[in-house]
Amino acid sequence: GIVGIAAAPDFTEWGFSDADKALLATEGRLLEPTPYGDDPLVTTLAFWQSGQSLRLLGGEIAIDCPVRLLQGQEDRDVPWQRALRLAQRLRSYDVQTLLVKDGDHRLSRDGDIALLIGTLGSLLDTL
């Protein structure tokens, strides 16, 4: 089985502005501030290009095992609608998308961790 937390397939399509893409093309890397630490987030052109070549959401995703997707609706990095789109594209019939209304990108609060552990436990019970 698979558990995804704030899964962001195809983020190179929607996660970068035209200005970001231009900077990547001209400078080979992009430095962005992040709320998750003091150091900037570094994205290299090679990383971005590999993401472009590995896009998934254009068609069916050939995954047939049970999948659980956890997504915070207050996530500023990955819009929660992305989890729904991913769920639609997965070939598996055993897909559940769990939205945490006040959850952020990390889903790291005690209640979020409890949800993750419970989700893992119930998924393991199905295998």
Residue positions per predicted region:
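The alpha/beta-hydrolase serine catalytic core
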Residues: 1-99, 104-123
